[in-house]
Amino acid sequence: MPRKNFKFLINASNLHMGGGVQVAVSLIDELSRMDDLPAGLSVLASDEVHANLQNVNSNCLRFGGYEVFNTYGISTLWSQLDSKASGFDVVFTVFGPLYLRSTCAVNIVGFAQAWIIYPNNEISSSLPFVQRVKKRLKFFVQSLFFRRADRLVVELEHVKIGLVEQGILDADQIDVVHNCLSSVYLQPDHWKPMSVSISKKKFSLGFVGRDYLHKNTNLLPHIKKILNDKHGLDVDFYVTLNPAEWSAKSEFFRGSIRNVGSLKVVQCPNFYQQMDAVIFPSFLECFSATPLEALAMKKPLFASDRRFVRDVCGDFAWYFDPENPITAADLIAGYIKNRAGRDDEQLTAAREFVIKFSNPCQRAEDYLRILQNAAIDCSLC
């Protein structure tokens, strides 16, 4: 058993949007509910993580220390994080890299930067030369900080393989802890409505996520146009972009797609409820919870034919080539005309599959075990 006086720090100060916030909220909330929570466990939460923890009524007073603190990228090197992380045996950054000048603690970092393990991806090759060089430089610098970790934690096996192939860390320094559905999706009493209403006059397809390049959202208006021109189907597409992301989209995009704005974790189930199906056209991921969330809400999922989806969803998703809007439109049209409203049995089976895939409580226990084992191993050195 681990010593009672080990001190652990969960660092979520650098997470401000997207799936990283959801994972951190789920992890911290589950830890707060443990009966045998270590007394020496402290948390640094960003404003966004803290706000979402409040939305799910998490009892953050259960931790030995809890502070709202924000860090942003490489500027963290000049922040107070060094002093706040001092005195701990283990520092676990939910998703890195961790930008610290130095640390005496065991440094464990969550890894979810697919650009580092798949540098020659579709997006990179399509970028202008200068932008491509900037991207490569950015992720090279990030990789240097990931290499400083004592251990990395990843969400799927293909990520571990990629890290080893890129020479980031050895296989025995990398742990796999499957991501999972947030417990929010199993607790309807925690769900909150969106601030905008959605018209249900047409078949509705939803995309949940930020507008990162690899999310491939620019494919959506092309799919919509092909559905209309080729198949005679007027389908509404909804996205969850923040104001800056929305204003940066083309007139073609904004004239074709509807935006409900960014959502809190507790609002996402309501968004899924109002969709007839979910689309996930991403080129590149380590892992994304969106496919799991869609299936858990019993929504048909149209997704990129990529390993990061197939490894999780198996035969429960409808797959298309993310580089080809015609294949996506044909797939969606076939579903609408032949399957829509007549596949409840498959959707129910998909939901049951997702719930069994992994669960938030087990994930939190797995993370905590990694921290405790690292502290014990270090104390024996």
Predicted segments, located by residue:
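Nucleotide-activated donor-binding/catalytic signature segment of Leloir-type glycosyltransferases, i.e.
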Residues: 60, 246-269
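Short hydrophobic beta-strand element within catalytic cores of glycosyltransferases
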Residues: 300-303
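Conserved acidic donor-binding segment of nucleotide-sugar-dependent glycosyltransferases
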Residues: 318-326, 333-340
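A charged, aromatic-enriched C-terminal amphipathic alpha-helix characteristic of glycosyltransferases
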Residues: 340, 344-378
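Aromatic "clamp/platform" in nucleotide-sugar-dependent glycosyltransferases that forms part
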Residues: 283
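Conserved donor-binding/catalytic core segment of Leloir-type glycosyltransferases
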Residues: 9, 196-215, 221-224
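Membrane-proximal helix-turn-helix segments that form the acceptor-binding/catalytic region
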Residues: 131-152
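A short, active-site helix/loop in glycosyltransferases that binds the activated sugar's phosphate group
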Residues: 146-173
